Structure formats: C-alpha cells, structure tokens
C-alpha cells in the first residue's frame, strides 16, 4: 500500500474496515485494528465510505485513529425524503421541497456536530 499511495500520489484513501454503503442491519463490525495498521503506514488522509448508520461511538473511534472524511449520503437522502413526506399532506410542492431541505440541513448539522464532537 505504501508503494501504491506513493506511486499514484493519492489525495485520500478510502479504507475497507467492515463499512458498507447503504444501511446496516444491526451494529456494524468495524475492524479498527486494520484501520490503525493502515494509518501506521501512510500519511494519506483516510476516508470512511458507508458512514450512514454507524453509531457515534464508532465514528469517534475511527476519527481518533485517523479517518478525516466520512460519507453519510444515505442518511442525508433519507432525511430529505422524510422531510418531504412530513409536508406532503398539504400537497404543496414548494412546502415539501422546503421541508426536505430543512431536514437535510438539520441532519448535516447533527453529523458535523458529531464529527467535531460538539
């Protein structure tokens, strides 16, 4: 891996430690030892794909070890849909879109707060 990251001059490296895109059935089993081993041999910023649904304590552990970017698109999309559905009874498209955007804003803020430990 050291040869690879040096040879291709990567900007960031997405690591597979038991994470997966989409939603998890139950608590995910992340391999923090593998994450630490990767961190120990590279200075490249590490990315966690499939961050949606990973509990906060596991996110914090991943950040402590070296994760610098966390992808949570599934949760963001779900927030948008739920927001739109919550405003759908009135049938006003613009109210639905506004509710979806507000839900995305709230979800994004909660994730930023989690990632920054606020």
Where do the PLM segments sit?
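Alpha/beta enzyme core
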Residues: 1-41, 56, 60-72, 78, ...
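Glycine- and other small-residue-rich loops at beta-strand/loop junctions that grip anionic moieties
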Residues: 24-27, 48-51, 73, 100
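Short beta-strand/loop segments at the ligand-binding rim of alpha/beta enzyme cores
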Residues: 40-50
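A conserved C-terminal secondary-structure "cap"
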Residues: 81, 98-102
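Short beta-alpha connecting loops at secondary-structure transitions
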Residues: 89-98
């Amino acid at each position: 891996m050291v040869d690879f990251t040096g040879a291709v001059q990567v900007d960031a490296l997405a690591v597979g430690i038991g994470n997966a895109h989409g939603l998890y059935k139950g608590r995910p089993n992340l391999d923090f030892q593998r994450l630490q081993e990767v961190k120990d041999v590279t200075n490249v910023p590490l990315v966690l794909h499939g961050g949606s649904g990973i509990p906060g304590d596991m996110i914090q552990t991943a950040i402590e070890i070296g994760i610098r970017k966390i992808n949570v698109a599934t949760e963001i999309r779900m927030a948008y849909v739920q927001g739109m559905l919550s405003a759908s009874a009135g049938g006003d498209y613009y109210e639905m879109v506004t509710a979806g955007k507000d839900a995305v804003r709230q979800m994004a803020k909660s994730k930023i707060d989690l990632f920054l430990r606020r």
